[in-house]
Structure formats: C-alpha cells, structure tokens
Amino acid sequence: QTNVSLKSLINDQFSIDDLQITTKEIKLNDIIALVGIFQNSPQLFILDTFVRDGFVTANINLNFDEKGNIKENYKIEGAVKKAKLNILNQFKLQNLNFNFNINKSSHSLKRLDMMLNNIKITSPSIEIEKNKNSFFVNGQFLQGKKNFNIEELKLIFDNLFNNIDIQKIEFSSKNNFSFNVNKKFKFDN
C-alpha cells in the first residue's frame, strides 16, 4: 500500500510519500540473499553461514523524502519462526521463535524461545540500542525447570558429586544481562 502525492506527479517529482509492505512467510536464507544483493557485508556473510532454516514475516513502513530517499523514521515489525542456527559447530539453536520491532535507533526482540544445545531457553525481551559506534544489548534469559541425572553432571563437575547420595538435581535460572558490542561484533563491555 502506498500514498502518492498528486502535486509531485504534476511537477514530475518523486511521487511516493510512504510505502507499506506486508510479507508472507519467507525463508530466512532467501531474505539474507536478497539483502546481500543491496548491502553486502562481512556480518551478512557470517549470518548466512550460521542460518540453517527458518521463516520470517514482516510489516515494513517506509517514508520517502522529495528525492526518493528513505527517511530515518522507518519501522519494521514481524516474527521469526522455526529458525535453526549452527554457530561454529558449538552452539546449536533450534526452534528459535521471536517477534521483533526495528527502527533507526533500536531493535526489540520479544517473546523469544529456543532450544540451545537441547536446553529450552526463553526471554520476555531483549533490547538493542544503537549508539554512535556500538550497540547496547540488554535483556533477560529464563530457563525453566530442568532435571539432570547425577551421572550427566559428573561429566561436567568431575568428582564433585562422588561422596553425595543424590540421584537427580532440578535447576531453573533467571539471568539478566547487558553488554556493549562494537560494529565489528567485538565485545567492549
């Protein structure tokens, strides 16, 4: 959907004031390839190597100036569903689902849930604020109750449980986090 200025049409100027795009479900890899055509970057290449599967839907609102340039008040809202990522063969994210809101200065991820190396993790919200030379990331991870057999933990904690008569342990966690990351994805803080 778009609005066209009659005055601009008559004066033979760029005539689109705003543009609203609503997508159907699109494969994440197809979106990454499409964005790569217009804005190729090392970060996009890295993302493409991590993403194995998944879908995105989006509502995109763009406003244009008289010259046809996109104004900085754009808004992108949508959802990622059933995403799978393999990060350096160490971290396997499966069934990654979240809603997102993106504008010039911030990115917001809501109702995130995923399996990370077969452990279910959720997050009510992760906020990413764009600063001059970095991004400030702030959020919370929740891990629901997880039962561990003592034999599974012995592999990690070695001899810690040898003299204790415990068969199973139940864990749950709530972790708040925040950090700065620069534009080359190096942690500053």
Q: What are these regions, as identified by a protein language model?
A:
Residues 1-2, 13, 87-92, 116-120:
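Solvent-exposed loop/turn segments connecting transmembrane beta-strands
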Residues 10, 129-131:
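Short, ordered beta-strand-loop transition motifs
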Residues 2-4, 55-61, 95-97, 120-123, ...:
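Short small/polar-residue motifs
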Residues 2-7, 28-33, 118-126, 147-151:
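A short, polar/proline- and glycine-enriched secondary-structure boundary/capping micro-motif
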Residues 1-9, 96, 107, 112:
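N-terminal beta-strand/beta-hairpin edge segment
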Residues 113-114, 127:
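A short beta-strand motif that forms part of the nucleic acid-binding face
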Residues 14-86, 105, 132-189:
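Extended amphipathic, helix-rich lipid-handling scaffolds
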